[in-house]
């Protein structure tokens, strides 16, 4: 839902630390002047403006929940500027939901105004985009199948509650692991902080960043707690975080 949460006046929602002000989670990959966005959140327009995004070459979707797809219509300026359709990569299930949710984009009714121009690509294994090998990493978001993505020595896994051993095998030798850690209390569709730490113990990335963070977790105090618990290599991600990835 983002932080601050509407109608909430808790300590984190009232925090003056800009790192406690969180839009919905998304990632921008930049390689050799080309860019890929993972998930077009409801905050996509503001996120793109914040980083000065002027070119978009592809979109990857982890799954089709509202907080990950509802910024889809805001890709139109990139179509107009680049005079090209954008490739979209997602699972068959996610593509089906996109077609249903944004029916005006995909039906055959003539559009009165501009609509997003895309080409759809169902993910069924590793693929290449902007000169980078993308490895899909299947996981479970409650009863729902979702995809994480590995690119070089980094991986991004948001919105998941469990991950099979076959997917864990795809995550060996990581420099950076970005993973779901919603809060301390159990949730049927997300990892807790302790579950995320257990996966960090198992996979042993050089660094780990927690994302999809609810308003129960304050940035500075949670990071201090992680250090005290013996995890100096783990921290909460924050809006605007950027780092280089070894491909």
Could you describe each region identified by the protein language model?
Residues 136-137, 157-159, 179-180, 211:
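Thr-Gly-centered strand-to-loop micro-motif
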Residues 44, 163-164:
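Short, surface-exposed beta-strand-loop junctions and turns on beta-sheet-rich folds
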């Amino acid at each position: 839902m983002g932080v601050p949460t509407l109608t909430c006046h808790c300590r984190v929602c009232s925090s003056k630390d800009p790192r406690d002000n969180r839009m919905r989670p998304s990632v921008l990959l930049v390689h050799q002047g080309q860019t890929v966005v993972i998930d077009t959140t409801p905050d996509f327009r503001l996120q793109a403006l914040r980083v000065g995004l002027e070119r978009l070459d592809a979109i990857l979707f982890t799954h089709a929940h509202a907080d990950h797809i509802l910024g889809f219509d805001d890709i139109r300026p990139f179509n107009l500027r680049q005079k090209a359709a954008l490739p979209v990569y997602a699972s068959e299930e996610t593509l089906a939901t996109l077609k249903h949710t944004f029916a005006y984009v995909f039906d055959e009714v003539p559009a009165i105004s501009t609509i997003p121009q895309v080409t759809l690509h169902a993910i069924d294994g590793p693929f290449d985009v902007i000169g980078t090998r993308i490895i899909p990493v299947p996981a479970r978001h409650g009863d729902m199948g979702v995809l994480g993505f590995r690119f070089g020595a980094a991986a991004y896994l948001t919105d998941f509650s469990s991950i099979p051993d076959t997917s864990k095998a795809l995550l060996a030798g990581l420099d950076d692991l970005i993973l779901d850690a919603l809060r301390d209390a159990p949730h049927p569709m997300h990892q807790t902080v302790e579950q995320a730490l257990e996966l960090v113990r198992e996979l042993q990335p050089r660094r780990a960043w927690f994302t999809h963070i609810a308003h129960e977790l304050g940035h500075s105090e949670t990071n201090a707690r992680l250090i005290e618990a013996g995890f100096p290599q783990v921290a909460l991600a924050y809006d605007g975080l950027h780092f280089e990835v070894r491909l």
